[in-house]
Design a protein with these regions (language model features):
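Activation/maturation switch segments at domain boundaries
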Residues: 1-133
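Ribonuclease/tRNase effector modules and their secretory precursors
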Residues: 107, 111-234
Length: 234
């Protein structure tokens, strides 16, 4: 029965036909027949995920933290929602995925960060395959070149010997670092090897240069992978 409040009007009139339609398992998803209610709950879960990662992105951005991971999660959540509605014949209601403070500008920045990271992920996958095949020897994870340490130390006897062997000096190292757009994060992040068309320079967190040289065949192949995946390199 329905409790009737006259000021609210008549109670909803559910017909047997409308109830049967609501409970009918007539929507197929992922190989199963689902009711409209079940589908709506699955969609709400995906909409909540989009909102969650929008809020996380805003919080990290406001704190000056790296937003790459949350941007990637947001992109995945949006894609999951879009795929779900496409598969079930539904539609995305932007009102249910709206988060205060996350507008067009924030959406564009998050999408750009996610696309850039996807390129690096794809390049790292290919580099690992080349490493396993013995095509390249360079170890580490391909990243966007970070800022170099404020002070760079070239005093190592090993580095000085390498300079002599390869005809390179401190000015070459500085030019490579300035022109570098990509690097390899090595030794659990304690060393960064900067790459550019001019060569490579490996620098520790303490600013000590551990190696320097022109691009060998492996280095050239690494840069080819960078170009292939549309990552800025010069």
């Amino acid at each position: 029965f329905f409790v009737v409040f006259p000021e609210l009007g008549s109670p909803p009139a559910w017909t047997q036909e409308s109830l049967e339609a609501l409970n009918a398992r007539d929507i197929e998803y992922n190989g199963q027949k689902c009711t409209r209610y079940e589908i709506s709950q699955m969609q709400r879960a995906r909409e909540r995920a989009v909102c969650k990662w929008k809020r996380r992105y805003l919080a990290e951005d406001a704190a000056g933290a790296d937003t790459t991971a949350s941007a990637m999660k947001l992109r995945q959540a949006r894609q999951s929602l879009a795929d779900f509605t496409r598969a079930t014949g539904g539609r995305v209601d932007s009102a249910r995925t709206s988060v205060h403070g996350f507008g067009r500008s924030e959406g564009s920045k998050a999408s750009y960060a996610a696309r850039k990271q996807e390129r690096f992920n794809a390049a790292n996958t290919e580099l690992q395959q080349m490493r396993e095949a013995g095509t390249i020897k360079a170890k580490g994870r391909l990243i966007e070149s970070p800022s170099a340490p404020n002070e760079i130390n070239f005093a190592s006897d090993h580095v000085l010997q390498r300079w002599a062997e390869r005809g390179m000096g401190p000015m070459d190292a500085e030019r490579i670092i300035r022109s570098s757009k990509v690097a390899m994060s090595q030794r659990n992040g304690t060393q960064t090897c900067y790459y550019s068309e001019l060569g490579f320079v490996a620098i520790g967190q303490d600013g000590n240069v551990s190696s320097i040289g022109p691009l060998d065949e492996g280095g050239k192949k690494l840069m080819e992978v960078v170009k292939k995946h549309g990552i800025p390199h010069s």
